[in-house]
């Protein structure tokens, strides 16, 4: 099988071969559309990249790896990419930039009836409480290597 052709636009860090494969080429990648509304992802690694779809059209995609499970979620939704970029900018402005952060995937419907995706930053305390942890100061998972 030929290597998928793509150009990385932006990423969480310099990606090693395994992480790049997981985020862009792996057949185990799940569509962001399949994440339930308000589903939490503990973002570890992520990448935004350009590739070509089956029709030969250039598309921009984003892939996010859950640091807890290693699962990768990917999609080409412009609204999701824009909201994710806003979250990354917000995280980058923090005094202590975390290696990981929580987002929730939100399914919305436009006034014209079209479905679209966005994401929102979730505080670690709120995310952990939603995951069933009641104690404070629960350590974040180690980043996936």
State what each model feature region is.
Residues 1-69, 112, 124-126:
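OB-fold ssDNA-binding interfaces and closely related basic DNA-contact patches used
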Residues 40-43, 62-64, 98-105, 118-121:
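Hydrophobic beta-strand residues in large extracellular and virion-surface proteins
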Residues 67-79:
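Short, basic/aromatic beta-hairpin or loop at an interaction surface
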Residues 77-82, 135-137:
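A short, sequence-level motif marking secondary-structure junctions
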Residues 82-103:
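Short nucleic-acid-contacting surface segments enriched for D/E, G, S/T with interspersed K/R
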Residues 104-143:
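OB-fold/S1-family single-stranded nucleic acid-binding modules
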